[in-house]
Each structure stands twice: as structure tokens, then as C-alpha cells.
Amino acid sequence: MMDSRATYVPPKKISESNSNAEEDPTDCSKPITLKVPTVSETVLATIPHKPQRHLTVYLEGCVGVGKTTMFKYVVDNMFVHTAYDEPMDHWTKWFPENILQTIHEAVNLPTQEQHAYVFSCQNLIATSFLARESGIVKTHPAPFDPSVDVISIADRHALAAYVAFPIHHFLQGRFTYMELQCMLWAFKQDSVDTIFLLQGCSEETLRRVKRRNRKVEHGVTIEYINSLQAAYTVILSTWYRATEYQYSAKRTVSEEISFFIAGPRRTLFYILYDKRPITLPEIEILKLFRKISNDLKKLVLIPVNFQRLVYSSALRRLQDLLIVTPGVTSYIHNENVDTATCAVADNPHFNHHDVS
């Protein structure tokens, strides 16, 4: 291989009084060796250094939709800095009772007792996410660059406990209006997160729930699955509307509210306004609407349907979306399911105008 080092020889000094001047005695010094950069070194030097980012990815969706299986597959087949499980020990071991079992059994209680148990348990479930999130350091999200970036993946986002399941309980008549409001006010989104919202066929989702045979889920029915799927549809359509909101001091309270409740009726804004107590002032409704909007605008929701894909294809799809999406957050849940799916159309491009 040719040596990339060159020898530098200093020029001879010329005497002004004699054109045939002799060499300067200082010319006897040792040659100076210079390093000539190789082509690869020159190219690397011209490329600006890109600092490594650490992105936390959340997977979210209905129980049984395939979150945990996907979660485990991602962890086993992709470099993951940290994998954050659901805070299951909080729910099943550390509290005085198994609150997952209690909240499922509460459906058989009289209405007043049912409301008290469900609301209490849902708050315990939600606060457990705060304990888990306290150890996660997040940076401002950016498109994922697999050559330099690393990701962590988390099973569920706090959005599930503070928003999705409370909406589900409200739709099922197990939450009062003000109990739903309390959970929505308690939700606080500080960082910019992106959530993969896993969707799927309700019948296939229920089949997977029955297949894994968890004791606390024996009471799960197709109505339960449909209600929870509807809650996530409400969140998605609400998020679309929230991203369009811009505050204006020129608009009146009524004009502001009119903006939020316009469009598809299947938004949280419309539900909260339509079901509001007659004694609740409109300004209180508007304050909550603005709060919900500000929280949801910090999320990037990516609706996907992986039920019809084998896991290797689903992983490639997930990686592609990470690269092109500005920020990542996703949900995943522990479940043992195979790749059998319902024969339903896969529509990754969710159209919020179709929400009825």
C-alpha cells in the first residue's frame, strides 16, 4: 500500500550579493513530515457530527389487540435501550388488593358502589404510570435515524389510564360526568410523545383475550372490546380536532366552544358538551377543552393495524414509521397470541372524517 506521508524539504536561501550563493547551513535540519489525509478521512471531516438522540416509543390500544406480543418481538429483534413494562406489580402485588381484579368484578355491584370502586381503582392504576414515568428521560422528538439514534419502548402511555379507560367507563355508565372530568384534569402531558395506536378487528381481539385466559379478564365481552375500541376512536378524532385549534382572544366563549364541537360528533369535546350537567357554566367547559387541546397537541398519534401482518413485516413497518415521523411514543401489552387475524380491510390511513 502506498504510504500517505509526504516529506517536506525547505527551500534554499538565495544570497543577494552573489547569484551563485552557497546553501544556508541551516538547511541541514531534519526533514519535516506532514500527514496527508486519506480520502475517507477527508469525507468524514466534511460531515457534521450528529448527536445521538434517545427516543422513548409507546405502544397503545385495546386489550388483546396484540400490543405485548409486538412489544416482545421488538425487544427481541431490534436494539432497544430500555423496555418499560406495564406497572403490573403496582396493580397486583403492592396495593392491598389486586385492583385489576377488583375493577373487573365491580361491574356486578350496585350502581353507587360500582362507581366508587371503579373510580378509586382507576385512580390507583393511573398514578402507577407516574411512578414509572419518573425514571424516563425524554428528549425533543425527531425522525428516528437508525444509524445513530437509540430507542426505548414502553408498554402503554399514561393516556390510557387517564383518558382512554375513563372514556370507556363513561360510555359503559360506570363513570359519572364529573368523575370523567376529574381524570381528564389529572392528565398532564409535559413532553412531546408519539404513540403507535394499535387497531384491529373486535372479534379477533376478543379471541386473543380468551386464548390467553387471564383470570381478571374472564368477564371481558365483545361489548367491552367495542366500547374500549370506541374510546380510542374518540381520542384519535379529538386529537385531530385539537391540532387545528389556535387560541384567539377575539373569540367569545360561545365561539370558542363552537369551534371545538364542530365536525364529527365522535370527539371528546362533543361528548363533554352534549352530556354536561345543566348547572355547569360554559366557561368551565371551555377551560377543560383548552386543557385537553394543549395536552393532545403534544402527542403524535400513529394509528396502525398489525393484526393482518406477520411480526417481521410489522416490525419493518414500525421502523419505517419511526424514521419518517417527528417523534415516537407507543404502547405494548403482555399477551400470548398467534398471527391469526380477522379478514378485515387493513386501513393504515385513518380518515377522521369517517368517524360517526
Curated annotation (Swiss-Prot):
<dbReference type="GO" id="GO:0071897">
    <property type="term" value="P:DNA biosynthetic process"/>
</dbReference>
<dbReference type="GO" id="GO:0005524">
    <property type="term" value="F:ATP binding"/>
</dbReference>
<feature type="binding site">
    <location>
        <begin position="61"/>
        <end position="68"/>
    </location>
    <ligand>
        <name>ATP</name>
    </ligand>
</feature>
<dbReference type="Pfam" id="PF00693">
    <property type="entry name" value="Herpes_TK"/>
</dbReference>
<comment type="subunit">
    <text>Homodimer.</text>
</comment>
<comment type="similarity">
    <text>Belongs to the herpesviridae thymidine kinase family.</text>
</comment>
<dbReference type="GO" id="GO:0006230">
    <property type="term" value="P:TMP biosynthetic process"/>
</dbReference>
<comment type="function">
    <text>Catalyzes the transfer of the gamma-phospho group of ATP to thymidine to generate dTMP in the salvage pathway of pyrimidine synthesis. The dTMP serves as a substrate for DNA polymerase during viral DNA replication. Allows the virus to be reactivated and to grow in non-proliferative cells lacking a high concentration of phosphorylated nucleic acid precursors.</text>
</comment>
<keyword id="KW-0237">DNA synthesis</keyword>
<feature type="binding site">
    <location>
        <position position="122"/>
    </location>
    <ligand>
        <name>substrate</name>
    </ligand>
</feature>
<feature type="binding site">
    <location>
        <position position="214"/>
    </location>
    <ligand>
        <name>substrate</name>
    </ligand>
</feature>
<protein>
    <recommendedName>
        <fullName>Thymidine kinase</fullName>
        <ecNumber>2.7.1.21</ecNumber>
    </recommendedName>
</protein>
<feature type="active site" description="Proton acceptor">
    <location>
        <position position="86"/>
    </location>
</feature>
<dbReference type="InterPro" id="IPR027417">
    <property type="entry name" value="P-loop_NTPase"/>
</dbReference>
<dbReference type="InterPro" id="IPR001889">
    <property type="entry name" value="Herpes_TK"/>
</dbReference>
<keyword id="KW-0547">Nucleotide-binding</keyword>
<feature type="region of interest" description="Disordered">
    <location>
        <begin position="1"/>
        <end position="29"/>
    </location>
</feature>
<keyword id="KW-0808">Transferase</keyword>
<dbReference type="InterPro" id="IPR050566">
    <property type="entry name" value="Deoxyribonucleoside_kinase"/>
</dbReference>
<keyword id="KW-0244">Early protein</keyword>
<keyword id="KW-0067">ATP-binding</keyword>
<feature type="binding site">
    <location>
        <position position="208"/>
    </location>
    <ligand>
        <name>ATP</name>
    </ligand>
</feature>
<dbReference type="GO" id="GO:0004797">
    <property type="term" value="F:thymidine kinase activity"/>
</dbReference>
<keyword id="KW-0418">Kinase</keyword>
